[in-house]
């Protein structure tokens, strides 16, 4: 069973009496397709997984997270500040120079007389701290220069991998950049202030709370999330330890409809011979909706983002 499949073969067979072991490959492919369709229709994941996301403070008392139910919160940080500066000072040789933060490290690109050179040797694994990253960049030559901002004994010891922020949508592997560095400084930022005054609700949001020592709180009674663009970074775990039965049944029924469609012309909705007629559920009734019985089971689990700017 694939890690992304909402049900396994055994569960699917409960809705497919009469299938044989030789059908397993086809059924398994349908389980994968229907599981993906359920996730997209509900606009959410169901399996527990870790999230590392940035949010816009909106001046409200609640900060709505994208995934729920929340199982735990690792950290809530705010105030992104520059912690590492990268520059390419050899403007005579290099006509272009850029830095990009990726999942594995820094990508440093320079173009000299039309020749592109890309260096990916500065990895988080080999350089676990910001100081180590700066030293590795400085050792490259070719005009590359980097320095830790502020107290080297503080930011310099921060984990370099924290520079990377996974995209909240899609399968991208870059976050900051590409930022120009030719003759000017590219500032790489981190959310470095740990928020103490918060509480989390399993239903999918954070609340501001005591203590009142956080600088962002102007007044003790002003328990809101200050307005800003990507001014909060939240690391948390969300999902269902066990996939809800209704979601499993919805996936199984969708698989059964897809399977039965392979036993006839899938575009055939009904057939009548003299006084005998038969009508089938169709995969093509509404391109925007799953079959009605599937939609009814999934209705309580759909994510609605109306009224939030968090996506």
Label the predicted regions.
Residues 1, 60-67, 117-124, 285:
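Short aromatic-glycine motifs in intrinsically disordered, low-complexity regions
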Residues 2-9, 241-311:
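Short loop/turn elements at secondary-structure junctions
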Residues 2-81, 251, 275:
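Glycine-enriched, solvent-exposed interface loops adjoining structured elements
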Residues 16-22, 119-124, 240-242:
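Second-shell loop/turn segments in exported
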Residues 34, 130-137, 251-255:
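Amphipathic, non-membrane alpha-helical segments that mediate helix-helix packing
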Residues 39, 138-142, 260:
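Sec-exported extracytoplasmic/periplasmic mature domains
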Residues 81-196:
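Extended, beta-strand-rich, solvent-exposed assembly scaffolds of outer structural proteins
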Residues 135-145, 172-250:
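Surface-exposed interaction regions enriched in Ser/Thr/Asp/Glu
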């Amino acid at each position: 069973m694939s890690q992304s499949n909402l049900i396994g073969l055994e569960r699917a067979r409960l809705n497919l009496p009469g299938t044989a072991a030789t059908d397993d490959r086809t059924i398994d492919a349908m389980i994968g397709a229907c599981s993906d369709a359920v996730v997209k229709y509900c606009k959410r994941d169901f399996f527990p997984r870790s999230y590392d996301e940035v949010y816009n403070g909106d001046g409200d008392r609640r900060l709505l997270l994208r995934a729920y139910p929340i199982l735990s919160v690792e950290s809530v940080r705010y105030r992104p500040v520059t912690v590492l500066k990268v520059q390419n000072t050899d403007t005579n040789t290099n006509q272009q120079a850029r830095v990009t933060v990726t999942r594995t490290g820094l990508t440093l690109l320079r173009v000299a007389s039309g020749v592109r050179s890309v260096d990916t040797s500065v990895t988080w694994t080999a350089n676990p701290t910001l100081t180590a990253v700066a030293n590795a960049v400085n050792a490259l030559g070719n005009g590359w220069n980097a320095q830790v901002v502020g107290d080297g004994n503080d930011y310099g010891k921060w984990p370099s991998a924290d520079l990377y922020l996974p995209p909240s949508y899609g399968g991208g592997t870059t976050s900051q950049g590409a930022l120009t560095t030719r003759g000017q400084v590219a500032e790489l930022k981190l959310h470095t202030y740990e928020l103490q005054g918060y509480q989390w609700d399993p239903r999918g949001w954070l609340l501001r709370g005591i203590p009142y020592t956080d600088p962002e709180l102007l007044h003790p009674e002003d328990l809101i999330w200050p307005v800003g663009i990507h001014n909060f970074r939240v690391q948390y775990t969300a999902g269902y330890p066990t996939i809800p039965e209704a979601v499993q049944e919805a996936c199984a029924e969708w698989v059964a409809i897809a399977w039965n469609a392979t036993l006839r012309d899938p575009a055939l909705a009904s057939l009548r011979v003299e006084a005998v007629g038969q009508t089938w559920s169709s995969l093509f009734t509404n391109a925007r909706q799953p079959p009605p019985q599937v939609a009814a089971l999934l209705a309580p689990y759909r994510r609605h983002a109306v009224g939030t700017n968090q996506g």
